[in-house]
Structures are given as structure tokens and as C-alpha cells.
Amino acid sequence: ESPISVDYRGLRVYECPPNGQGITALIALNILEGFDLAVMDLFSPEKMHVMIEAMRLAFADAKWYVSDPAFSKIPMQELLSKEYASERRKLIDPKRATVDPRRGSPVNSSGTVYLSVVDGMGNACSFINSNYMGFGTGIVPKGWGFTLQNRGHNFSLDPNHPNVLAPGKRPYHTIIPAMVTRVSDNSLYASYGVMGGFMQPQGHVQVLSALKDGGLDPQSALDLPRFCLDAESAGGRVDIEEGMPTATVNALREMGHPLNEVSGYERAVFGRGQVILRDESGVLCGGSDPRADGYAGSL
């Protein structure tokens, strides 16, 4: 299937289409494009607030619309339009959290591995694979030595939901490798991904913003503390990683965000990313997430 994309500040960001959740990151980036993140301090309360709110709005849509397009019509063009993003952006209160946002109406009618490879010519491979939830189903086909995946866990049992369980149907899928090119000449800007279930689109948005809006190199972008919205809803609890400035955490709480500060081994909830950035002269720069045992190297 062809990837889906949006333009973000001169870059073209590619994600996997539904039934994958890549559209979540693209919806959030469209919303965030209306805010001048580059002039905001790296961890200012204002910046963290709008990023969290954009992810909430994106998940509100994704949790409803992402399903198997062979079974349900998904308004892809409308969901990814700048006009729709503008309308959704108006729902963000700069002073208060929206804990339980509703999906929009765009039509007017846990055991994952990721790798990225880029060659000297700028050809790139962004690859991700997962059985889901550790060992998937835990069922090993006799004589084959691997476990079967359990992606059916992400079906809805609501008979009125587009992602409702049905024979021969693909469920909402979390794994989404990403690719970014420059709009001006279609040259490669970055090949990257962030493992971690429903953290993946959230990681994509935060890492890309750190690269483009923050001007950071891949390793520095991956090293930054992150936030993670609760996987079970578009709103609810927001996990905040240790290292986020105390003043920012306190300000977000005052805005109404229900925060949970996370440290130590529990930081696995924030995902594990890999990035290869290619500058305009063709020089490659890689980074690997310190939250896992990955590695950035050259051959």
C-alpha cells in the first residue's frame, strides 16, 4: 500500500496508512504547524501543553476512524487536510487541558523491533516488526519455533464502531515506521521510528519536532524527556518522564493535565527510537535511544 503524508514546515512526513496508526502522528503535526514551536523554550509549559493537546485530538480521531479500509470508508483526505487541522486547533485552550476530547467530523458530506538503514546515495529503509504484547499469543506452531501475533487485541467489540471485530478484517495496528523528505527537492531528510505500542505516533511527533523545531541532532532529540498519553483513551492520564523541568510539570498540572511522573525502569513506556538524519550535503547522522539497547553505527 502507498504511504500517507503531510507537509510540516518544508518537510514531507510519510507514515503507514490505516489500518496502521501513522495517521495519528500526521493529524497531530498538522495541528502543531499552527503554533510557532521554534520560538518556544524546549520544555516550556506552553510548548508541552499544545503538544499534549494536539496528541489528544489526534488520538480522539484515530481511535474512531482507524480500521481496515476494506471494510470501512476512512475520510483520509479530510482528516489530513490543513482546513480540518485548523478547525481542530481551535479546540485547544492555551490555559486549560481538554482531558476528554471528542472525535471530529472531517466529512461535510509491546515487543517491537525497529531498524533504519541509509546508504550513500540517500536510499533508505525504515523497518519495524512486532508480535505485539511480548510474545504475542504465546502460541507456537508445531515445528516452526516462532510465536503467532495477537493483533486482534486491538479490535473493538462495539458493533457500531468502524474497527469492530469481523471475519477477514484487519484491526487497528500500532507499528508505524516513518520517513521524512524535503518538500523542495524530495531529498531524504530522515528515516526514523519509535517503538512502543500507542507511544509510537507520540514519539514520532516529539522526536520530529525536536529535530525540526528544536534544531537538535538525532541523539539529542532521542535523549530528551517525553510525555505519553494513556493508551486506553484520547484523554486521561499523561505520563511525564523524569528530567522534565519541575516548573513545567507544575504548570501543566495547574492547566488541568492529570500527570503521572515516571522514573527508573518504568520509563520503558516512553518508547525506544532510532533516527538517521541526512543533511543537504548528504552527510548522515544517527542516533539510538538510551532507553534501550540499540546502536547507531556506520559501515
Q: What are the residue ranges of the model-derived segments?
A:
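Long, well-ordered, tryptophan-enriched scaffold segments
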Residues: 1-18
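Glycine-rich phosphate/pyrophosphate-binding beta-alpha loops
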Residues: 14-22, 112-116, 126-139, 193-201
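M16/insulysin-pitrilysin zinc metalloprotease superfamily fold
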Residues: 22-38, 180, 184-190, 197-222
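Internal maturation/activation junctions in enzymes
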Residues: 34-131, 143-144, 151, 263
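Cofactor-centric catalytic regions
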Residues: 91, 95-98, 102, 110, ...
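Extended C-terminal subregions enriched in glycine
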Residues: 121, 169, 204, 213-267
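Active-site rim segments in enzyme catalytic domains, especially the processed small/beta chain
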Residues: 123-186, 190, 200-201, 214, ...
